[in-house]
UniProtKB/Swiss-Prot annotation:
HAMAP family (alphabetical): GTPase_Obg
GO molecular function, one term: magnesium ion binding
Function: An essential GTPase which binds GTP, GDP and possibly (p)ppGpp with moderate affinity, with high nucleotide exchange rates and a fairly low GTP hydrolysis rate. Plays a role in control of the cell cycle, stress response, ribosome biogenesis and in those bacteria that undergo differentiation, in morphogenesis control.
Domain Obg: 2-159
BP GO annotations: ribosome biogenesis
Residues given in the record as GTP binding sites: 166-173, 191-195, 212-215, 292-295, 321-323
Subunit (UniProt): Monomer.
Keywords: Cytoplasm, GTP-binding, Hydrolase, Magnesium, Metal-binding, Nucleotide-binding
Protein name: GTPase Obg
Signal peptide: none
Compartment(s) of residence: Cytoplasm
Annotated InterPro entries: G_OBG (IPR031167), GTP-bd (IPR006073), GTP-bd_Obg/CgtA (IPR014100), GTP-bd_prot_GTP1/OBG_C_sf (IPR036346), GTP1-OBG_CS (IPR006074), GTP1_OBG_dom (IPR006169), GTP1_OBG_dom_sf (IPR036726), OBG_GTPase (IPR045086)
Protein source organism: Mycobacteroides abscessus (strain ATCC 19977 / DSM 44196 / CCUG 20993 / CIP 104536 / JCM 13569 / NCTC 13031 / TMC 1543 / L948) (Mycobacterium abscessus)
């Protein structure tokens, strides 16, 4: 079973908002209590948060499908539904969030860094919130909206100061084990290291993090060996260290050719954070060369022979032995000085006043176009019309009538008439297709009344206040009867 996972694909689904409640207040001696249905609760959101105690994406490897709780339904007595709890997913420091197209959505660095992966759906309004002068006791409520549903790729890029690169069995894991308290797997065969190993190196009163990545071989860019994918863990490293095996017996290999081969593979790697990292490209990172295994006499002689040639590249060269621990102390202090110099060379972050710029959403706009798949039909697109469709309970005639009133006030009906829509033609809004029937001809003033009634044709025997005043004046002889 894998214990270290640095790349996973997750499917996150936010909670659905609770439905609104259609309720009428019932109380003794109050025959007209009015609507008292509460609103539905908001669905829970899916949030990624950095936790320093988490070091791998292993949990998401076994449980990639994640869903936040739904909001609860509103109830009578003006009781709103409870909001769904947010689902907070703990991720390691250095996690990069990418979408389906490979675009970076967030780079989570630092304890407590957060990213809203999927927003919860809004709750539906109860009939108390829908009451108006024309519709005093609505017999319907709005449905809750579904939460966002996304597929995200999480990549872990280790946060370290020094990255060790080299051929397999060059002694990288051994170097980490003797410089820190880390206990990586060490064996006398290549590709012993399959996952990055981190260790904290102490230099006097200072300390830094060192990362050991699996070995590189020529042709890794084409997939040989373990490939180049694990090099994502050195993208954040301020200093790169070439660990060279001076005691290798493989034909055709020497320290200089090994360094050239490593540089060639590093140049072919395309960092994901190249445009976003303040450290710049990998080719611009400070480098050091560690000539390892000088406890072997032949290796010590070879190290002395190539030191001058390697130094001409402008990189510091160190002769060390992880077995006898010779040369380790000067190496650690030199690496710390390189880290300090690299940090000082970084551009100072400009402290600017945080400005929140929400993504503009045109909720008032909509478009009406001919339906290419249904001759004679039309398609209505817009944030508000499509949301209203999702919130409507089509089993309730009054709710459907309320939807028609909202679309008419928005101007959808007039736009359909301008495009030559005929009564009975198919109109698609969101996932719903229905036969369109205009409420009134275009240009006619609409008399506002409750759904299901028409003040222009409905007659009532109820005597109004104006009629009672007129009758009282006639009885008193103040006016002549009509």
């Amino acid at each position: 079973m894998p214990r270290f996972v640095d790349r996973v694909v997750i499917h996150a689904k936010a909670g659905t908002g609770g439905h609104g409640c259609a309720s009428v207040h019932r109380e003794k001696f109050k025959p007209l209590g009015g609507p008292d249905g509460g609103n539905g609760g908001r669905g829970g959101s899916v949030i990624l948060e950095v936790d320093p105690q988490v070091h791998t994406l292993l949990d998401f490897h076994f449980h990639p499908h994640l869903q936040a709780p739904n909001g609860t339904q509103g109830m009578g007595g003006h009781r709103n539904g409870a909001n769904g709890d947010d689902l907070i997913l703990k991720v390691p420091d250095g996690t990069v969030v990418l979408d389906d197209d490979g675009r970076i959505l967030a780079d989570l660095v630092g304890a407590g860094a957060r990213f809203d992966a999927a927003a919860g759906g809004r709750g539906g309004l109860g009939n108390a919130a829908l009451a108006s002068r024309a519709r005093k006791a609505p017999g319907f409520a709005l449905l809750g909206e579904a939460g966002a549903e996304v597929d995200l790729t999480l990549e872990l890029k280790t946060v370290a100061d020094v990255g060790l690169v080299g051929f397999p069995s060059a002694g990288k894991s051994s170097l980490v084990s003797v410089l820190s308290a880390a206990k990586p797997k060490i064996a006398d065969y290549p590709f012993t290291t399959l996952v990055p190993n981190l260790g904290v190196v102490t230099t006097g009163e200072n300390s830094f993090v060192m990362a050991d990545v699996p070995g590189l071989i020529p042709g890794a860019a084409e997939g040989r060996g373990l490939g180049l994918e694990f090099l994502r863990h050195i993208e954040r490293c301020a200093v790169l260290v070439h660990v060279v095996d001076c005691a290798t017996l493989e034909p055709g290999r020497d320290p200089v050719s090994d360094i050239d081969a490593l540089e060639n593979e590093l140049a072919r790697y395309q960092p994901t954070l190249q445009d976003d990292s303040v450290l710049g490209d990998l080719a611009d990172r400070p480098r050091a060369v560690v000539l390892n295994k000088v406890d072997v006499p032949e290796a010590d002689e070879l190290a002395d022979f190539v030191t001058e040639e390697v130094s001409q590249r402008g990189w510091p060269v160190f002769k060390v032995s992880t077995l006898t621990r010779d040369g380790l102390r000067p190496l650690t202090f030199a690496l710390w000085e390189m880290i300090v110099a690299a940090r000082a060379a970084r551009p100072e972050p400009v402290k600017t006043r945080p400005v929140i710029r929400p993504i503009p959403v045109d909720e008032s706009g909509f478009t009406v176009s001919a339906d290419p798949q249904n001759p004679g039909g039309f398609v209505v697109r817009g944030v508000r019309p499509e949301r209203w469709i999702r919130q409507t309970n089509f089993e309730n005639d009054e709710a459907v009538g309320y939807l028609g009133d909202r679309l008419a006030r928005l101007g959808v009906e007039d736009e359909l008439l301008k495009l030559g829509a005929e009564p009975g033609c198919a109109v698609t809004i969101g996932d719903m297709t229905f036969d369109w029937e205009p409420q009134t001809p275009a240009g006619v003033d609409v008399t506002m009344s409750g759904r299901g009634t028409d003040a222009r044709i409905d007659k009532t025997d109820r005597v109004g206040a104006a009629e009672r005043r007129q009758a009282r004046r006639v009885r008193r002889g103040q006016v002549e009867p009509e």
